[in-house]
Amino acid sequence: MKVVLLSDSKNLDDVVVTAQGLKRQKRSLGYATQEIKSSDLTSVGQQGLNNALAGKVAGARFVGGSGAKFDEGKIVLRGTTSLSSDNGTAAGAAAGSSPIYVVDGVITEAAAVNMNDVASVNVLKGPAATALYGVRGGNGAVIITTNNAKEGEAHQQINISNTLTWTTAYNHAKLQKEYGGGAYGADGELDVYHWKEGDPESYKQLDGKKYYDYADDCSWGPRFDSNIKYLPAIAWDETSPYFGQEDTWTSHLDMNDLFQTGVADNTNVSFERSGKDFSSRISLSNMNIKGVNPNSGAIRRYANIKTAFTPLKNLRVSFDYKYTYKKNHNAATEGYGTESNNPYSDLLQWGQTNVNLKQYKNYTRPDGSFRTWNIKDYNDFTPAFHDSPYAVYNEINNTNTREFHVLAGDIEYSLPYNIKVGFKTTANLYNFYQLYNRAGLTGQTDIHKQWQRKSYDVYNQGRITWDDKFINDRLSAQAAIFIENRNYHYEGMDVFTRDGLLLPGLFRTTNSYGLSGGDDASTDATTNEVGDYDKAYTRREKAQSLFGTVTLGWDDTYFVDASLRNDWNSTLPTDNNSYLYGGLSVAAVASNWFKQAKWLDYWKLRASFAQVGSALTPYRLSTVYNFGYRYGSTASMYGNPQLIDKNIKPTITTSYEIGTEFSVLGNRLWGDINYYSRDTKNQIISTTVGPASGYSSRLMNAGLIRNRGYEISLGGKPIKTKNYEWTIEANIAHNENKLVELAPGMTRYTLDGMSFFSYLYSYAEVGKPMGALYVTRSWQTNENGDIILKKNKAGNLMPQIDKTTEKYIGNMQPKLTGGFSTAVRVYDFTLRASCDFRVGGKFASVTNMWLEGSGLGSATAGTNDRGGEIRGDISENGGVRVDGVVANEDGTYSPATTYVEANTYFNGLKSTLWEPYVYDGSYIKMRELSLTYNMPKTLLNQLHIGLQSASIAFVATDPFLLYSKVKNVDPSETDGTLFEQGQAVSTRSWGFTVNLTF
């Protein structure tokens, strides 16, 4: 038997788009990049670019969220390099900062990308690859190339595609179904109503019926019994159709009652035409989304116009305009409390298992007040803490719109000797408007808020490029010089009402009950006579840059690339606003040394060194006065409480990396391995100073963060025949992140902490990875970590709480990240699937803390190891088992076991600690699944309608969470910070995509 291994058509001379739009042969690059094809990004109709990249790029960590948020998520390349996050605060620093997104040469945001137009994505991971982007490329770059018409030939094409998906919520939380609402205790009994003088006459019919504690928003009530009838809260409401109706004392709380089936309809139409001297393409997309939360939805609209032509010999002109419109209405929010648009998390943290949510869909009484399950008493319908979830859905209206206008114009002239000169202008215009109205909810005044943001970011760039070969084409040379000017302008305004509305339901700033004066004393602009406060602000930034790159190659085997850039930035001190940096990389195509090895198709070695600087946000160096409270008609102002170090220097990142890439066995097996080390020094941070200085903090250079890690990508085609093909790819990455030094006398820098129950903090600590977690309240333990038990006044052994010792409990940083994808083609059918995973990385769950503290969680019920009820009496073998030790008189400890009453343990002890609710964030999640049928050419030709290609696909996004170490929440949807404070419900989408090309 003779076995022949067919080679793959993988092109080893692929041309990729690198920094500043320069096109290079992939074999010549001395740094790590990863290109993802359109088919791997758009097969399931992902709505966001970052969602589509999840698990497909080695070293890229995807930080996502629920589909109910209509959010694009973000990616982080190679960990964090800063002690402050993207927004300038420390809280998100350990999560890392995002790369820049460059769409057809224009720096914009991931939110501005229309996935229907994406042709390819090239991810530049390190400073050596992104040095030509200057300060903005320090965290990597995602280079997006959109579809073009085929310039240089007569061509005309129309493409129509539609993706229709249905989205459902799925609930991770496991609730106990044995005990009801209130705080009576497991052995308690429901109260019995007896009519009395002063009660409504209609209540006489309710005499003798049972009810419970409606006001206590927990589930520590009596055991369920289907033989017992009781009056739910709504049964006391004479205006309700449920008046006087009893329910069985059983579990009625079903979280699925909170949601509806969402629908997303995405249609794209594109037209392209080209000839010898011109090309043009127009693309239009419209997407309407109905959310899984009632009264929620989103709109996405895109337009893309690309044209290029040659009016004169050697002169090429191109123009590109992209428009993006995004509107979100009542997108789910996350957080602890009742103000968020997230009744799901609210009910998981505080709720009653006996409540039938459907009874409260009609939440408005004839007098305009709201019904709720959480009334104060049967004769007081005022909500104790919580409104009907349907009131929250409908009486909070939170709408935001974002508009992106991305423009680029380019003119290039070809001179003799392969020299080209060009000029490019790009502009990224951004408009944001948010309107928030809240009416009549519990314990909250009616409010009207408006936020408005506008910005433009304009680049003017001149360039000279040269590309030639010498010495019988053995020596190749490329060079480019750029001069660039950037103007950035940002302005915003915030207007809030104060102390409620004069006329309920009239949401206008002029309808504010209170006058201005500012609940927010940090406002930095004039406060006027309307609203809670009226805050307006403007930021401007200018930068001048001169940079260039040179690439030399010998025998198509050896390559060296050098780049150099100097920036002058307006946000830095005059004496330090100029900074020079650059990079050097080398590559050798080692497979050319072993041409006799037929099994070795391609092998490259590479190494690089680079530096890149970063600047401040505008006005951080200025001592400015801010407007504060208004006293009558007199405005007040206060100075900046921060001391500014006038010698602040730019932050500098220095990076080294080495790597190799290969392809063997007829390009049937390929891989890429990379190791990097990255030091970021001169961190610009705010440190505390003594009160005698007259300031509260000091802005200064301090800190060195070191990132070291590796990235491995492997792929192969075990099967490749005419009718069968199987492709499999996987990647894994490890990043070791450490704070090496801080300012003299400093050993730690606070990154995050909870605003309530402030016993858990995240620090950047010298000698440890970023995001070290400490608690200041924990179980009291001996040196072996055993819980110490002591007798209370009743003589029962109880676990002790240590309120004085700071305890290290782990780190936020994951140990490994990666992904896996596969595609199987059988004739004209192709099955695709992709997953991503994370190993390690701690986070704290508020949801789990209050699931147990409120008695909702399944862990608070059931039986213990003695066969008794966890909520039963200790004397009857009930209670929660706690293993620990007791102290002996000689200072030693002996093992001991005790049982603690469930409410005392979960609500009085455990839920006052953070340590039990800090979890390993490891997970494996299937992100995409699709089955596509591509109509064969023979069938298309028989239709005689000009159809060039046609396909239909079954698609699914986020269909399964395959593995998780934590219950009740989804670790893949934490936002990358320390706390999960109340997740929006997880979603999965299923549907169909049809694609036609004429």
Q: What name fits each language-model region?
A:
Residues 1-304, 309-311, 316-318, 390, ...:
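Short, small/polar-rich motifs associated with maturation and membrane association
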Residues 101, 552, 780-781, 824:
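Short aromatic-centered micro-motifs
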